[in-house]
């Protein structure tokens, strides 16, 4: 697994249609493809904060290569403060309603970057179910920094929750704080029926066909080699960045021993919120919880 900072492709900036409401805090929303360190195009959306637009109402615009920001045009004025980079769960993407809902809540606290992991949505490549996805997140974080943001908080759900942990461990100092929601602590867990179904989806040719045509997720056929650092192994390497672990007590995928292992590994740098009645990942995260996460991010990112 390479840990170099992700590179960038020629950026395709977006412009809102004329009827789109003005964005508060200055700047305009953008949508672009980023290039990861291993050459995968990642569909990414930037919202300056205050108002989140429907990403379907913006268009890609081919930009010139070679400038500092990947385009011949000046980057719009943006906040120099907090940005929340959202990493969705397996089978999600930047256009999914639950991801847009998360972005809408987080926009009250700062700018928001959402993106589609490889093999998901409009992004290229095929999903490696949390392995090389760390490079996708690295590209999104680098983009946020390039746009001028000095405080970055990554927020990941399920698969994305494991990715934000490994990214922070591999790129120490690249983020100010990390939030991991509904994440596994260890790999290859098959202790619940949903996880057994997921392993069938990922490891069997027939399962990958279901993933492609039923779930709009293109899954790589190769097994991990080598096996990446597990989430619980990654957590101690995140320090001194603060870590928030969030998990629902009704999560059907990963029981509560997973978040407790992560919190124990974090020691004094970690917090654990066990949410009564909550199920799994962004689909199950209620708005009050998302607001509490936003408050935590503002407080911990400095």
Where are the regions that the model predicts?
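The serine-hydrolase catalytic nucleophile loop
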Residues: 90-103
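Hydrolase active-site cap/lid region
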Residues: 173-224
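Alpha/beta-hydrolase active-site loop
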Residues: 128-147
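Conserved alpha/beta-hydrolase "acid-adjacent" motif
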Residues: 252-258
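Catalytic histidine-centered segment of alpha/beta-hydrolase-like enzymes
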Residues: 278-290
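N-terminal cap/lid segment of alpha/beta-hydrolase-fold proteins
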Residues: 2-51, 60, 72-76
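Conserved alpha/beta-hydrolase
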Residues: 103-124
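Short beta-strand/loop motif that positions the catalytic acidic residue
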Residues: 238-239, 245-247
